[in-house]
Structure formats: C-alpha cells, structure tokens
Swiss-Prot record:
Keywords: Cell membrane, Disulfide bond, G-protein coupled receptor, Glycoprotein, Membrane, Phosphoprotein, Receptor, Transducer, Transmembrane, Transmembrane helix. Residues 7-26 have a biased composition (Low complexity). Pfam families: 7tm_1. Residues 64-74, 136-154, 226-275, 333-389 are cytoplasmic. The chain crosses the membrane at residues 39-63, 75-97, 114-135, 155-175, 203-225, 276-294, 310-332. One of its GO terms (molecular function) is vasopressin receptor activity. One of its GO terms (cellular component) is plasma membrane. It comes from Homo sapiens. This is Oxytocin receptor. Its main location: membrane. GO terms for biological process: cell surface receptor signaling pathway; cellular response to hormone stimulus; female pregnancy; G protein-coupled receptor signaling pathway; lactation; maternal process involved in parturition; muscle contraction; positive regulation of blood pressure. The gene is OXTR. Belongs to the G-protein coupled receptor 1 family. Vasopressin/oxytocin receptor subfamily. Receptor for oxytocin. The activity of this receptor is mediated by G proteins which activate a phosphatidylinositol-calcium second messenger system. The keyword Methyltransferase does not apply.
Amino acid sequence: MEGALAANWSAEAANASAAPPGAEGNRTAGPPRRNEALARVEVAVLCLILLLALSGNACVLLALRTTRQKHSRLFFFMKHLSIADLVVAVFQVLPQLLWDITFRFYGPDLLCRLVKYLQVVGMFASTYLLLLMSLDRCLAICQPLRSLRRRTDRLAVLATWLGCLVASAPQVHIFSLREVADGVFDCWAVFIQPWGPKAYITWITLAVYIVPVIVLAACYGLISFKIWQNLRLKTAAAAAAEAPEGAAAGDGGRVALARVSSVKLISKAKIRTVKMTFIIVLAFIVCWTPFFFVQMWSVWDANAPKEASAFIIVMLLASLNSCCNPWIYMLFTGHLFHELVQRFLCCSASYLKGRRLGETSASKKSNSSSFVLSHRSSSQRSCSQPSTA
C-alpha cells in the first residue's frame, strides 16, 4: 500500500522497484486497491499532525519576532528549528496527506522528484539544526569563553541548511513518475541493484538518526559532567563561606578558597536552556526510533508485515517531532508566549476601541445631519404657511 506511507521514501515502493527500470515484473495487470478504512485513519492522523505543526511553529516564530530578547543565541537557533519544522509540515506532511487522499500521485515527473527532494530536506534540516543547538549549549556550558559569536552562529546555520540541501539530492535521482500497473502511474523509487533499497535506507538511518543520536549523547554526557562538577564547586563554595575564619587561615585553606571563588558558576538560566534542549532531544529520539526501526525492518526482512495497520501508522508518527517542539518551547520559555498573548490582547483592545470610536463618531455625524435636515424642513414649512391676519 505504497500511497499510505508517510515516509520520505516508500519502503514498499523501494522493494517493488528493485529490479532494473523498465522491467515488467513490477507491473500488475489490474488496478491496485487499498484499505479504505486504514486510509481514512491515515488522513485523520496526518490532518492532526499538520494542524498542530503549522499552528505551533507559527506561534513560536511570531513570539520570537515580538519578544524584546531578539538577539539571544538560543532564540536564534529556536527560530531556525521552527522554520525547519514548518518545512517538514508543508513539504512532507501536506504532500503525503494529499497523496493519501488521492491514492495516486497526480502530477508531472518534475513535481514528483521535487516533492520527494523537499521531504528529505525537512528531515535533514530538523535533525541537524537540533544537533547544532545542542552543540551550542555544550559549548556554552563547557567552554563559555570559546562559545560561538553571532556571526559564527549565522555561518553555522547557513552551512547546515546548505548541507541539508546537498544531502537530499539523491532523492531526485531515485524517485520518478513510473508505471506501476497497466495505465497506472505513481511516484515510486527505482533502484538498479536489488540491494539498493537496503543500502539507501540504511544510509538515511545512519545520517538522520544513528550518527546524530551518538553526537547528541556525547554532548549531553559532557554537559552532565560539567553540571555535576559545577554543583560540587557550589557545595564547596557554600561550605567555605560557612566555615569559621580560623579554619581557612592556613595556606592550603586560602588556596582552596581562592580556587572555589575563581570558578565561574553556571547560571540557572543556562541550566534551564540545557533542560529544554535535552527534552527536545528526548522527543526526537522517542518520535523517530519507531519510524527508523520499521524502515530498517521493511528492507532487511522479506517477511516484514508491510501491510499491517500498526506498521503503516508508525511510519506516520515520525512527523510528531515537529509538533512536540513548540510545546517544549512553551514549557521552558513561557514568557515568550505570555508576551505574545499580551501583545495580541493589546492589539485586540486597540482595534475594538478604535472601532467603537469610529462608530460613535459616525453616529454623531448621523445625528447632526438628521438634526440639520429636520431643522431646515421645519423652517421651510413655517415660511410656506399663509398669514392668518
């Protein structure tokens, strides 16, 4: 049921098209059918994901635009991660939703290749911008004096977007509009070698999931160690401050006290941002693990239940990661959304006040005009009456 997959590449289509292009073994005589009940579930799930991703990330971008702290490095990375999640919603979830509604891809070959290319761009961008944000937090905690400057941040984000555009290029060559049955065309993958689907999906799994997760684990391992070390220093500083003066009178006591006081302790704000990025990473792992597990299973096991409902629905849930991130931002940076709500309420109040003033002014003009007209008409009537003398 190739049209029901929410993946950026169709595992079933890949398996079906493993033979050389033009081979007749991949075509069927009659028109393929699908489970309409399952298709309705897929459409409902994708509609919900699309609505949540669009509304949530649009609110994040609007909140970041209206906040007073526009030059925060964390907010800079949040902005680009929200843009990447919007790319996932618009160019991955929306095309798949339309595809599930129509069952077949209706469009030219160029559109087929473009859609499949943009679907993977969103995946790569969302993953590697999250990785870049985590590296930034790691540098901010472990080496605050060497943390990236604003210009370097922009260059790193630009390089990440360009790298994602390049890494997604194989999609253009793999997918094309081809005949899958007599007179039936669809946007399917074509692999020249039988091992092509295994190699390609394994590479995507390594590039988008396994390698980033390893790097993220290393980053947060270093961050955890640094925070633990910092807590020890805070405890030592508190103990040194409470100790009697005579206890630190010796040279060793003075050296230890100087060492503790010279260490720059990590602020609570930095720890809060680390918690936020850690939860985002955890959501990334939870959302993507079932998807890649199912993808690898589908190409490495010939007996995988590719038509099972649970198997297909799991593939749809990968895009949930783009829905989760805005709620995580709201949890840890609630002031952003509070400012957005306040701005919205102020604008609404100003609009309603202006509208009431406009209506009042129009009403006064109307009353004044009616008074003048009635006064004139009464004057004319009094002048036109004949004299009784």
